[in-house]
Amino acid sequence: TDDLPEFESMAEAWENMPELSPPLIENVLRQGHKMLIAGPSKAGKSYALIEMSIAIAEGRQWLGWQCAKGRVLYVNLELDRASCLHRFRDVYQAMELPAANLQSIDIWNLRGVTEPMDRLAPKLIRRAKKKQYIAVIIDPIYKVITGDENSADQMAHFCNQFDKVCTQLGCAVIYCHHHSKGAQGGKRSMDRASGSGVFARDPDALLDLTELELSEDIRKQETNTAICDACVEQLRRHAPAVLADASPDALLSHVEALKLCQDNLPPAVYEAFLSEIETIKRTVRQRTAWRLDGTLREFPKFEPKNLWFRYPVHVEDTIGVLKDLQSE
């Protein structure tokens, strides 16, 4: 005898189908399954995983997809403890969510003491057994890879460790990995993740981030919008009657909106606001744009999503500014 399951008759199962696992991320990933997020280092993958941790803990949306609410373990292999904790708080604040379910997020800080995944998995399982997590997030996996990442059999053994965590804890495992070297735009999503093809074919969902090349026109448009929004906020605070009477067109041009501020804000407030405008311009310059594509085992393929990475969070482009841009 062995410890493998017996063969099943389809005839016996036909009228008595087992329940499918409920979704963890609507139309993307089921509870108890595995997901890989791949992308270059500047894509903000760690921030995306922290956003996901928060969305699961609070039962909110992540990048436009509804998440099931539950407990989550974030395994931090890269950041020092203080940086990781600050990053969580920064992302919470940028997502503008009340921190109502902090008790649902646990962090395992392993920087400097990490081990290969085949030794780490049993320790993780033992510690997490009674915690009732619905997701374990491992960031990043290059820190725990055992063997040569270009070797199919060694990577199959490595990926099996994630299966053990899923099976024994009954939770999803989500992890991120870097892109292979070279231009990514012409490759399929499952060929972009670095290392053996096992990486891309093993998870139940593969999400892939590629950078979009921003035109100067779009940068100017974003700067204009950001300055107009800031002007509206200043007028709302200091000259609400002027804001109520202003024509909508005047509030869509940063030149006209700034003129309204200059004419109606107290001089000291306006001077301070001008230095704030310089910060806004710098912040907009630092924004990057991304296309999120996916290969899913359990759900139909979704239309690629276009995202802004507005440090420290990703924001879905809901108005279509990025839809015609090419990936780099």
Describe the role of every protein-language-model region.
Residues 36-37, 42, 47, 135, ...:
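Phosphate-binding/switch region of NTP-binding enzymes
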Residues 31-35, 70-71:
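Pre-Walker A (Motif I) flank of P-loop NTPase domains
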Residues 1-2:
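Short, small/acidic-rich helices and loops at N termini and domain boundaries
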Residues 310-328:
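DNA transaction DNA-binding modules
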Residues 12-13, 19, 25, 67-153, ...:
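Conserved inter-motif catalytic segment of the P-loop NTP-binding fold
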Residues 18-29, 61-62:
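Pre-Walker A adenine-sensing motif
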Residues 48-52:
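Hydrophobic positions on the alpha1 helix immediately C-terminal to the Walker A/P-loop
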